[in-house]
Amino acid sequence: GVASVAIHKCSQNSEAFEEICIASRTKSKCDALKEKLEGTTKTKIQTAQVDANNVDELIALIEKFNPDVVLNLALPYQDLTIMDACLATKTHYIDTANYEPEDTAKFEYKWQWAYREKFKEAGITALLGSGFDPGVTGVFSAYALKHEFDEINYIDILDCNGGDHGYPFATNFNPEINIREVSANGSYWEDGHWVETKPMEIKREYDFDGVGMKDMYLLHHEEIESLALNMPGIKRIRFFMTFGQSYLTHLKCLENVGMTSIEPIMYEGKEIVPLQFLKAVLPDPASLGPRTVGKTNIGCI
């Protein structure tokens, strides 16, 4: 998954990342990644077990390892506990996705932005949304405004996955987060306010360089929120992502039978969340790399 990709990239830049501690609820996964990387990098790698929902455990781990920065690649539900631990230890913080309550399929920056003054007073930095989208797409937009244009009024962010993993249905990142995102209402920013749409209501076609013509659908995405706040003169920001017909057909069937629900149900005397159960039976995104062929194309217009 994304954590493995990030750790590989850090290890390729050992002059900057001299030492890394990989921590997860399942330490064996960290150990396997360490073993895979040993002999390929000068970066010293340690591993640890931690529950990212437990602030005290996080504080203890940070104090033991004493890192310069915590790179949060856990679930979005865990952003705030990790930020609390960074505040308590005065450690810089980076993440790739904004906070989302586990029991509500709604993500926005307000919870994390509320930490701004606390981090400022502690003398530490929190860098939010540092993936590709959000992340690089924000850099593209800010660079264009600073160096290429006097004013930018409209931004469309397009995310095209032109790869094929050979499965009838699988997600390229955490299935639980992916399905919550694409099955939620869409929204875009226009003339100073949010416009909400039904899931997959707005569809467009676009000819992506190196990929070809693809169907894309308007989604809510967190960088719309940050760009609307930080791009003076902006009138409209939208986010589109491509999906193949097989993906959409499977998703609709799963929705129809209740498998995308986040409401707990009782099954054989145990409480389960249908979407979390679905995640357990779908292919692990970390396993898709070797069998995926094709290109991706992400950018701003």
Q: Residues of each region from the PLM?
A:
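N-terminal Rossmann-fold NAD(P) dinucleotide-binding loop
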Residues: 3-7
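Aromatic pocket-lining residues of Rossmann-like dinucleotide-binding sites
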Residues: 10-11
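Short beta-strand element of Class I
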Residues: 19-21
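Helix N-cap at the beta1-alpha1 junction of Rossmann-like dinucleotide-binding domains, i.e.
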Residues: 26-29
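Conserved Rossmann-fold cofactor-binding substructure of NAD(P)-dependent oxidoreductases
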Residues: 49-67, 74, 78
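N-terminal Rossmann-like NAD(P) cofactor-binding module of classical short-chain dehydrogenase/reductase
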Residues: 62, 68-72, 86, 93-94
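Rossmann-fold NAD(P)-binding glycine/threonine-rich loop
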Residues: 97-124
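C-terminal catalytic/substrate-binding lobe primarily of soluble NAD(P)-dependent oxidoreductases
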Residues: 146-301
